[in-house]
Amino acid sequence: MDVDGILGNRDSKLGKSSIPRRRQWVKRRETWLVILGVVLHAVYMLSIFDIYFKTPIVHGMDLVSPRFSPPAKRLVLLVADGLRADKFFEPDLEANFRAPFLRNVIKNQGRWGVSHARPPTESRPGHVAIIAGFYEDPSAVTKGWKANPVEFDSVFNRSRHTISYGSPDIVPIFCGALPHSTWATYPHEFEDFATDASFLDEWSFDQFQSLLNRSNEDPKLKRLLEQDNLVVFLHLLGCDSNGHAHRPFSSIYLNNVKVVDHIAERVYNLLENYYKDNRTSYIFTADHGMSDKGSHGDGHPSNTDTPLVVWGAGVKHPRPVTAKDHSDHVLRFIDQHLHDAPTPKEWDLDGIERVDVNQADIAPLMSTLLGLPCPVNSVGNLPLGYVDMKEEEEVEAVLANTKQILNQFLRKSQIKQSHSLFFKPFKPLASYFSMLNQIEELLSARDYKAAMQLSENLRSLALKGLHYFQTYDLLVLMATITLGYIGWMVFLVLHVLQAYTLLPGDIFRKEEAVHEKSNTGKAQLCGCLFMAVVSVLLFLEHSPPLYHAYFAMTIFLWTQILNEYKFIKALWRYLCGRKSNYVIKLLALGVVSVIILELLVHSFTERKLYTWCFLIVGAIASIYLYKSIPWRSGIPVFVCLTCWFLSLFTLMPAEIPDNNKLVNASGVMVIVIGLTGKWLDLNAGVNRFWFGICNHEKRKPRFPMLFQLQALFVGLSSVMVFLSTSHRTEKQELHTIHQLMNWFIAGFSMILPLFSENGLLSRLNSIFLGFAPPFLLLSIGYEAVFYGALGLVLIAWILFENSLLYVHKVNKSSASGKNLGEHAFLENDTRYLQLSDMRIPLTFMVLFNVAFFGTGNFASIASFEISSVYRFITVFSPFLMAALLIFKLFIPFLLVICAFSAITKLLEVPRIGCYFLVILCSDVMTIHFFFLVKNTGSWMEIGNSISHFGIMSAQVVFVLLLFALTNIYTKDIEIRSGSRDSRKVM
């Protein structure tokens, strides 16, 4: 009887003399494939930093000095860290406004609006946008967030002197290496979340007031303060700290709004009385807002909308709103919020003109008020709605802003052109010089309106040109990496087809057609020549070394694929010769596989997909079994119920709440499952649907009390959870004896499965019991129940496969009396892979992912509950705590891989062949995550996108290591084959 392989029926067999050579060839090639896979995924993992996280900052531009008289001699920048726009503008419950002084400024002295921040809405990127005029440098993700990772220009750099007081996390970024600055910060210890942090704001003001008072007795300091181009920066951290600790609806946070308003009033009065020249400009704003939960970082309006109030020298006075002010610009701010958003009625400011800006627009505004060159890296647009200047001066200010952005564009263009052999310029700015000349001519002709319009158009084109060169190499790199991944997957498929499947006789008739590369020299030569040409081009373009690696890996893979030209050609002819229903079946398998893998991709952000998955799979699998085997066996019902039980866990919160009663109950549940498994192992073997997985021999076990010992350890771990939690609740220190017992129980219980019987069910039952104690001791809530539910589903998977195996053998034996296994086996009692075997790696992928997402997600890991490691360690030790957390995450993975290994033995399929299919599935997901990497958004969003891609890329190593680890437990599992009545060792 022919045996159906992935791509056909067996027509002939290899000679006995060729089997050793084939084994050696397969072994060498697989070793080489694993090494290649590790290197390839490591190299390609780094590609995202060249594609998505390249710094936009360039150096070497000339400053653009403004051609107008500065309206102000000095400028005061007040930044209320973490102040939400709505909490600043809205009244309190008694209809009194929290910022009376600044509201008076809005109505009588200056201009106001909402400053729109771009995610990540954090303190450092927010201040960089305000003071330097550009948004978060994406390359900072590789260098750390707190410290300033790259050199950049700022308004402070261009000032004659800068005075700054505030947080040690912010002030040193801008003033730490600035020689013409006077600054001070309070100690980190002052940032105590248990207190009202508004005193930090008072500290900053007191330092500045003390400086002014000292100047009356210090002539040198007095002269310094009398200079023009002076910048005063007060960083007011109180709202941020109080928002984190007490939430933005708390009385402490709302009172802090009054504190910063009072500080703004005192700073204004202090300086007006000190200078008495009306030459001081004032800007009050915030770096980001604060969510209702007391956090920030993402693009929610509560985080991106911040107040902006500007008054003093060079600033327009308030203007009533007119009908034309509400025209729809159909434009969006940097946070994707529309222009002309209606002002809430409760703010009572809808009658006064509102001028919203992007956060980076504040930097050119400050430069213009002081008559300074804009920071050379700024991408902000000067908001003319704030500056009070003559029409000619307004055009000059916008032109200076335009030239500064244009200089960045020209510098990037110059750098790229000097390194490119086939340079593609940004065509819309090919005639930028004539546009500048035209603006100058319009200025000379005093046609200021036309000059303004042309300047703004040129500025807009320059910003688009910056984006063009920022993403200049993106398409080539993404295409190269994508082709590399596709080449790797094609190469894997070819290897699996050659090594683990039965193919038609015309492909296998001549052994050398498969194993010997008689005409591969041409392909190798072409690949080497092509790589040499590409390397020379990359070298001449001064490309980074990693660019060479990206291209080399991709070219190498496709060269190897071309080496298999004869095999691919024969395979194509074979497929073309098959019936259409077979091709449809093959295509259907591919489509279903991709759909399942795409659902897994989306499950990384939506855990509830697993609920629907297991509800549907449980029903379909049980119906399928119900039609194939008698319902009295109980297996269809068991499969359905266990899948539905597991589906509940992805509906539960990712942040696991404390519930130690559940942990204790889970210990009982694990013992009951283990006891049931033990009974079935001893008594269910006579049932034909359990045949092969139970311990059939009635011989005395090597360690007759092993099960009782394991059950005892599970019970002890539940008791220790109760005792440890009781001590913590009573605020008592964990006893050393308890700590030692927990370590002993967790460690010793994992060794015991090695001494269990080597029947499939008995060994897996022992592994389940062996890893339960450490998992229970590291659990704080429902994840302990999940452990039992996952174990039940894994048993259901094994029973499902065993039932299918039985039905398949019955059907085949009724069709033919021949020995089904004859000629269909590779070696070591493993058969060739069949088309239907693709369900094994797909099921593994689903269970492997649910082992992680069943109890949380990436965000919940980042904010794990410290009490989960309290039973092992009470003294803060980040490395040991992280190790315990990672080990806890690994335990469900280990269970899944043990079940996977057992199934490959049960079905007599090659485990390494299935491993390559798992990697193939992983790489389909990896390519998707490659295109989902983000360099904008909150740090959590950026970090999660990198984590998703990185984890899938690392799976080639991760799964292999877990295979090696679990092989210690599964290598001697024995399966009894009904057809041969023999035992096979894994």
Question: How would you describe each model-predicted region?
Answer:
Residues I35-Y52, Y472-M986:
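Alpha-helical transmembrane segments of integral membrane proteins
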Residues L77-V79, V231-H235, I283, V309:
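Structural motif
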Residues P138, L382-T471, T482-G484:
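Phosphate/adenylate-binding glycine loop and adjacent helical scaffold
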Residues S12-R21, E30-I48, P71-L77, R84-L230, ...:
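Active-site-proximal alpha/beta segments of enzymes that process anionic O-linked groups
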Residues P66-V79, P91, P120, P138, ...:
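Intrinsically disordered, low-complexity juxtamembrane tails/stalks of eukaryotic membrane proteins
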Residues D4-Q24, L454-Y468, I507, G527-A532, ...:
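Membrane-proximal N-terminal segments immediately preceding the first transmembrane helix
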Residues D4-L14, V26-L33, D50, L63, ...:
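A long, amphipathic alpha-helix that forms part
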Residues F284-A341, W347, G351:
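Histidine-centered active-site microenvironments of extracellular/periplasmic hydrolases
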